[in-house]
Amino acid sequence: MRSQRHFFLNHIAQTTPNPLMLEIESAQGVFLYGKNGEKYIDFISGISVSNVGHCHPKVVEAIQHQSSKFMHLMVYGEYIYTPQNKLAEALLGILPDALNSFYFTNSGTEATEGALKLAKRATGRYEIASFKNAYHGSTAGALSIMGSDTYKQAFRPLIPDHLMLHFNDINEIQKVTNKTAAVVVEVVQAEAGIIKADLIFLQKLAEQCKKVGALLIVDEIQTGFGRTGLMFAFEHYRIVPDILLIGKGFGGGMPIAAFIANQDLMKELSFNPILGHISTFAANPVCCAAALASLEVILAEKLHLLAEEKGKLLESKLEKIVDKPIRRAGMMLSIQHKTMEDNFSYCNFGIEHGVIVDWFLFNEKATRIGPPLIISEEEMDWAIERLTR
């Protein structure tokens, strides 16, 4: 009989020649458990997904309750059902008044695609600006605005009229003109190794977009739902995006994302032509129920307000065991190594000792650290002890 590893390598499409190959049987809270009794602490939250931890009882209960009623009824946007409406109502309570219309999707990259279409449709323009070392997804439109030629080159030609700007460079802002449909920006460039936007830069960018009539699309797929110390990272900067992208930590572990805009703007996708953006599984009722439960957990346990304090505590503990620079935005951290080899060695050491850490897509010299927001100090110490060399 073929092993699970053999089957995985030969029949499950691979994204890299060297997958991690951890065989996980179950997960609870901040821990993953292997088939042979191995115990790992998830120090990356499944890449910014498990903000409330794995299999949170409230999320599991919501999934079980909704799945006993119905799991799919019709393609997106046709039927009225409670999980979708309740989730939208809850989001209204934590967002600025202008962001009041929600298009739920299955993944972050789908949210990006929808936002790009909406921007082009609403402005009648074609140019999309984004930033070097930015990541917004891997489908064709999102790939076109990705901030790395390394990952784009093999798939050219991509969507035309893309303007690549340098992040945190105020002189670049003037390149956003009345030809620009939208500027897509991360408040924290996660895949660059945790690079925070400068306050003045982001505020000036928002002003320029308003001045020339370009839409400001803020990507909070990794930073949203408490990861940076507020519910959304843009709140630190006193700006309001025209379109907001959310995903990853949104669903409590289930696949759901969204692009969010003002109702008047979002209506542009409903006519000329009708069905301007459609999806079969978007706003899946089970995923909506999970997302609502996850949001309720974050609010009830004040996880978003505790993330800064916990992140600072974790940073102080890491500083005692690594003599390297550490970057941090709330509970998003990176350890800066001198070489890629040093970083990969550290990541492998962590996994071998039960601590799952990883590298970044556009910064192979940095170690990614971002545990679930529910992590306790005792659990931090469990990881720190095992990361000590």
Residue ranges and their predicted role:
Residues 1-389:
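Conserved N-terminal phosphate-binding loop of PLP-dependent enzymes in the Aspartate aminotransferase
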